């Protein structure tokens, strides 16, 4: 046994340290640039048709293909939003051929999407198209670009969105990992709930690229990446300075501006810098003015230190304040006490976040590169709300205050190397990093008014550290077949200083978890890819709870399998589908409004996803996503094993009409079916279908737009929960649906000037 272990260890070391074996074939060293200058274009797909060999450009716009037999080949370069290029390249024995190409922007076309490149590009291309073709004006719109993702807002825009994905009520982020340029959005051990992910500091016009994934299959995604993950990349280059203004019903105003700090004539220099700012205000459609306001700012500087080194620094932040009408019980509306847009008890809140993120990317040689980022965030949050009214305190009411004040810092680093073992191409990625959160005075209190604390339910300092490392190996068994395997290890250190103890002191606990993952990807042809993924993941639990528990219950595992395919039946149609299953060992649900943890036992979710993107004609583009999930608790008897708010059927889609190169309109819909609001399905959260209409007229220097939300003025509930409440003077509590009404008919107009 000892000899076997030694051999396995030696093989492992060999896989990491093996270098490319020399061959007598030729190779291609290429660069792809954006436009006339020498700004690299990342994510362009390279494909040699005759021999079915592919690559994708890195952050330097470079790619390297080796072991190419001698001869002439047709090389195809494509990228969403750019004109596809086809050229003939000659490969000579023992010679590295230099290849440089400049790509120019063009209308978005399905035929630019390739399924011959690496799997990440293929699976993220659908949202890449959507990012180019759909109007995006808020972080809500950005999240809706993820196929199957549903969101709801129940604080007028102030709180993080409630998310639904693959049968998960993700709440504000328990099972979806969000990040921007390598910086996490989710907040661990947050006062309002574990994984709280407020993405409102993102200015939508700054987003250059969106990647996403469903399931716990990515090695570099750790905590919260069980149902899925979303990663945004901001622009390095602002092509045009611009000013944009929007105005609409209910006192809605939005202004955003971006200024390129580098003169356009410096397009061939090695530096880029821009600043962007945004302001939002609305009273919203509720009976009581919501007084929502938010200010965002972003500054980013990028220096191409050399052909092989990129350094980027971004500073961003936002500050927001609001009033809210809160969730209201259906019986109050039915009795005529309030309207659908009324209130029982006023709510209010404020929050801010300021970030610094330093990114470094170095290409070590044609076969390997190193990338890293260091981030620092200052965050605060204060929320007054009342979900149960007079259930617990019939005199003062049940208003609670939640407060969070923290500093978060972290570092991510990875080294990637491409080499060969004999004639077998191999790609290795080794990553490591840490995250540290220091929260001062995390608070949940029963309050009266804005200043009187009646009772503190949770109050203390939190320190949480996450150390991690991962190894990811890809073996290119044939040009069409890739096997990927690896593992990730996460180690958590939880410290809680409970001020409510008679003798306050730090209580600590530690836990670690391995998360192995594997996948097999097969390109059947130029137009079809099949894949199988297996992965383990986890979501950590609140430090205030796990500090007093054994390590077995801190990081419950998630096990998941996906079997899927991506098809292009012909050049204008892109289809993707997947059948999947995900098991959770235990669903710890932190109820931030009550300061308790509700372990709901093991669960299983099974379902399928279907997405379609279709360029029907030059003037008509169709897109649709359909998602089905069956979610059940495994330790409960049939009939009482429903998972509250787990959506069974969701669908999003639309049609875009391009009348000419300047004018376009779009009609969109989103649908979510009825879903259980409690464990025995006796209370139903009603589904809805809502239609939106958009129109846009764009020229080189200016742009006009119109958007109508809820075109048919459908009555729908954006957020809804089965909640036990008691109104003033009610003799007994009542458990029923409490909801936040969805947007009624709403129209807004926009104008932009580019310079």
PLM segments and residue spans:
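Transmembrane beta-barrel wall of Gram-negative outer-membrane proteins
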Residues: 27, 247-281, 286-325, 348-365, ...
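Short acidic/polar hinge/loop motifs at secondary-structure boundaries
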Residues: 66, 184-214, 232-233, 299, ...
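Short strand-turn segments of transmembrane beta-barrel domains in outer membranes
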Residues: 211-219, 227-263, 285, 554, ...
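Face-selective signature of the C-terminal outer-membrane beta-barrel domain
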Residues: 304-318, 349-499, 523, 569, ...
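Membrane-embedded beta-barrel scaffold of Gram-negative outer-membrane proteins
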Residues: 359-361, 369-387, 523, 529-537, ...
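Gram-negative outer-membrane beta-barrel transporters
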Residues: 415, 580-583, 599-679, 750-754
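C-terminal beta-signal and adjacent terminal beta-strands/loops
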Residues: 622, 674-678, 697-755
């Amino acid at each position: 046994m000892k000899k076997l272990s030694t051999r396995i260890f030696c093989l492992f070391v060999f896989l990491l340290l093996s270098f490319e074996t020399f061959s007598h074939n030729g190779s291609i060293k290429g660069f792809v640039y954006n436009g006339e200058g020498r700004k690299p274009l990342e994510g362009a797909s390279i494909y040699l048709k005759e021999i079915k060999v592919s690559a994708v450009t890195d952050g330097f716009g470079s790619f390297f293909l080796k072991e190419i037999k001698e001869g002439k080949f047709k090389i195809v370069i494509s990228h969403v939003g750019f004109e596809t290029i086809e050229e003939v390249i000659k490969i000579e024995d023992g010679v590295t051929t230099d290849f440089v190409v400049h790509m120019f922007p063009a209308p978005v076309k399905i035929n630019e999407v390739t399924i011959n490149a690496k799997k990440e590009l293929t699976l993220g291309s659908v949202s890449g198209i959507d990012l180019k073709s759909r109007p995006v004006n808020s972080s809500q719109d950005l999240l809706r670009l993820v196929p199957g993702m549903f969101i709801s807002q129940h604080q007028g825009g102030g709180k993080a969105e409630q998310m639904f994905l693959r049968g998960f009520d993700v709440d504000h982020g328990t099972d979806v990992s969000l990040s921007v340029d390598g910086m996490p959005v989710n907040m661990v051990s947050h006062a309002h709930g574990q994984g709280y992910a407020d993405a409102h500091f993102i200015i939508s016009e700054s987003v250059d690229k969106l990647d996403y994934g469903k399931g716990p299959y990515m090695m570099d995604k750790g905590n919260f990446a069980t149902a899925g993950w979303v990663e945004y990349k901001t622009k390095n280059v602002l092509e045009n300075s611009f000013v944009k203004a929007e105005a609409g019903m209910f006192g809605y105003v939005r202004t955003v501006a971006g200024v390129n700090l580098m003169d356009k004539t410096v397009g061939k220099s090695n530096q880029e810098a821009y600043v962007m700012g945004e302001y939002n205000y609305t009273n919203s459609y509720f009976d009581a003015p919501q007084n929502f306001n938010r200010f965002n700012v972003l500054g980013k500087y990028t220096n191409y230190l050399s052909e092989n080194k990129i350094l980027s620094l971004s500073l961003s932040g936002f500050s927001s304040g609001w009033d809210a009408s809160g969730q209201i019980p259906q019986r109050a509306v039915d009795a005529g006490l309030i309207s659908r847009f009324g209130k029982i008890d006023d709510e209010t809140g404020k929050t801010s976040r300021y970030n610094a993120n330093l990114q470094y990317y170095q290409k070590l040689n044609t076969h390997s590169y190193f990338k890293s980022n260091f981030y620092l965030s200052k965050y605060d949050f204060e929320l007054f709300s009342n979900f149960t009214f007079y259930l617990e305190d019939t005199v003062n009411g049940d208003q609670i205050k939640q407060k969070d004040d923290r500093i978060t810092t972290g570092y991510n680093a990875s080294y990637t190397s491409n080499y060969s073992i004999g004639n077998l191409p191999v790609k290795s990625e080794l990553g490591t990093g840490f995250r540290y959160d220091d929260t001062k005075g995390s608070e949940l209190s029963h309050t009266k008014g804005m200043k009187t604390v009646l009772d503190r339910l949770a109050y203390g300092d939190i320190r949480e550290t996450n150390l991690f490392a991962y190894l990811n190996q890809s073996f290119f068994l044939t040009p069409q077949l890739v096997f990927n395997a690896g593992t990730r290890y996460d180690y958590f250190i939880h410290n809680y200083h409970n001020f409510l103890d008679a003798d306050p002191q730090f209580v600590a606990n530690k836990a670690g978890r391995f998360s192995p993952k594997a996948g097999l990807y097969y390109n059947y042809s130029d137009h079809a890819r099949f894949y199988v993924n297996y992965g383990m993941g986890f979501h950590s639990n609140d430090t205030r709870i796990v500090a007093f528990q054994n390590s077995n219950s801190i990081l419950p595992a998630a096990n998941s399998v996906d079997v899927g395919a991506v098809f292009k039946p012909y050049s204008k149609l892109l289809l993707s589908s997947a059948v999947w299953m995900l098991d959770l060992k235990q669903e710890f649900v932190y109820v931030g409004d009550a300061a308790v943890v509700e372990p709901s036992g093991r669960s299983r979710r099974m379902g399928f996803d279907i997405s379609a993107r279709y360029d029907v004609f030059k003037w008509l583009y169709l897109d649709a996503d359909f998602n089905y999930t069956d979610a059940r608790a495994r330790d409960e008897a049939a009939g009482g094993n429903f998972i509250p708010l787990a959506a069974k059927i969701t669908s999003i889609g639309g049609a875009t009409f391009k009348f000419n190169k300047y004018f376009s309109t779009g009609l969109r819909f989103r649908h979510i079916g009825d879903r259980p609001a409690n464990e025995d399905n006796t209370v139903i959260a009603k589904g809805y279908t809502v239609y939106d209409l958009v129109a846009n007229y764009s020229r080189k220097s200016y742009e006009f737009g119109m958007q109508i939300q809820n075109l048919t003025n459908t009555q729908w509930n954006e957020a809804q929960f089965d909640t036990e409440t008691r109104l003033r003077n009610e003799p007994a509590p009542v458990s029923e649906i409490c909801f936040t009404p969805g947007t009624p008919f709403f129209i807004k107009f926009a104008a932009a000037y580019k310079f």
